[in-house]
């Protein structure tokens, strides 16, 4: 029984549930009123990259000390005639924001602890305080028609997860946080 349970968990990690919602085309993604292009060093400048559906950014209820945000991200790959839509949710631990860690470090210094400032950076790199999950996904052709193709967990890791501090994938959840709450996650106390 345990083996069946572990096998089913492994299969879920490889597959993403179908995304509910509208298919989008490459032309739709270029509508700056509805979608925001998220700059990336991997972009070629030919319409590829990540796009945030601005109407999908929603704060969710979360346990004390956390904040949660849900949004839809589209990853455009025009050369492959493919757009992947991902419904994502990010959980933010408020005690892991950079401002909170700096304040805690300064408090420790006042109490006589001689901890170097680089420890803040190392602490943040060890745990960014942001956990992302993909709730659903869909794949489309550049013209917006549905494409029957699965989204695999290893592709998600390359595109958006995990949100590691100092990594380009850290930019997306911070942008979502700022859109939802009007302040950068790392500026929260």
Annotated model-derived regions:
Residues 2, 17, 22-23:
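Amphipathic/hydrophobic helical signal segments and adjacent flexible N-terminal regions
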């Amino acid at each position: 029984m345990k083996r069946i349970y572990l096998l089913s968990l492994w299969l879920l990690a490889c597959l993403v549930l179908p995304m509910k919602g509208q298919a989008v085309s490459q032309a739709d993604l270029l509508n700056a009123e509805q979608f925001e292009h998220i700059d990336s060093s991997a972009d070629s400048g030919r319409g590829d990259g990540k796009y945030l559906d601005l109407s999908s950014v929603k704060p969710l209820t979360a346990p004390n000390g956390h904040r949660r945000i849900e949004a839809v991200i589209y990853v455009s790959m025009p050369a492959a005639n493919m757009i992947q839509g991902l419904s994502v949710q990010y959980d933010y631990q408020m005690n892991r924001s950079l401002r909170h860690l700096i304040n805690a470090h300064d408090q420790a210094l006042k109490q006589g602890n001689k901890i170097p400032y680089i420890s803040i950076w190392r602490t943040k790199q060890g745990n960014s305080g942001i956990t992302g999950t993909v709730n659903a996904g869909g794949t489309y052709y550049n013209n917006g028609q549905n494409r029957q193709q699965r989204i695999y967990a290893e592709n998600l890791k390359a595109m958006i997860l995990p949100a590691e501090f100092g990594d380009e994938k850290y930019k997306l959840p911070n942008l979502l946080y700022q859109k939802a709450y009007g302040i950068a996650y790392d500026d929260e106390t």
